[in-house]
């Protein structure tokens, strides 16, 4: 980051990160063990099908929150669309609860 923009962007981003972490923590403190979401907003696109960098970035948008908040998350396959393209689900837990993610995802894959 340019020196003139450091405070404007980096520090603001860290404040947003803290708000997100607090929001997630409130959910976990209410008794939720795992948050389950789609991994991506759509099924996978074919190799070479997308060349727009923004569209490719947006395909990962649901994974950003776990990365920003440093919460452990795992993505596992959960099925295929009518064209045979895969899609998955992402599970997010609070820090230190990776064992819950591994256990639930293992059970899901065995029974899917």
Predicted features, each with a name:
Residues 1, 40-43:
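Short glycine-rich anion-binding loops that position phosphate/pyrophosphate groups of nucleotides
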Residues 1-22, 53, 57, 68-112:
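Structural helix-boundary/capping segments
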Residues 23-24, 62:
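Residues within well-ordered alpha-helices
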Residues 28-29, 67:
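Anion (oxyanion) recognition and catalysis
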Residues 32-33:
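Short, high-confidence coil segments that cap the C-terminus of an alpha-helix
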Residues 45-55:
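Glycine/threonine-rich flexible loop motifs
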Residues 59-65:
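Thioredoxin-like thiol-disulfide oxidoreductase module
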């Amino acid at each position: 980051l340019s020196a003139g923009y450091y405070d404007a962007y980096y520090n603001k981003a860290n404040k947003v990160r803290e708000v997100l972490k607090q929001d997630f923590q409130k959910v976990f403190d209410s008794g939720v063990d795992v948050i389950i979401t789609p991994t991506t907003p759509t099924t996978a696109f074919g190799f070479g099908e997308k060349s727009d960098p923004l569209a490719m970035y947006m395909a990962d948008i649901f994974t950003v929150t776990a990365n920003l908040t440093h919460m452990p998350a795992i993505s596992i396959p959960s099925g295929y669309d009518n064209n045979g393209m895969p899609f998955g689900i992402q599970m997010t837990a609070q820090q230190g609860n990776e064992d819950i993610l591994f256990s639930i995802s293992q059970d899901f894959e065995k029974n899917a």
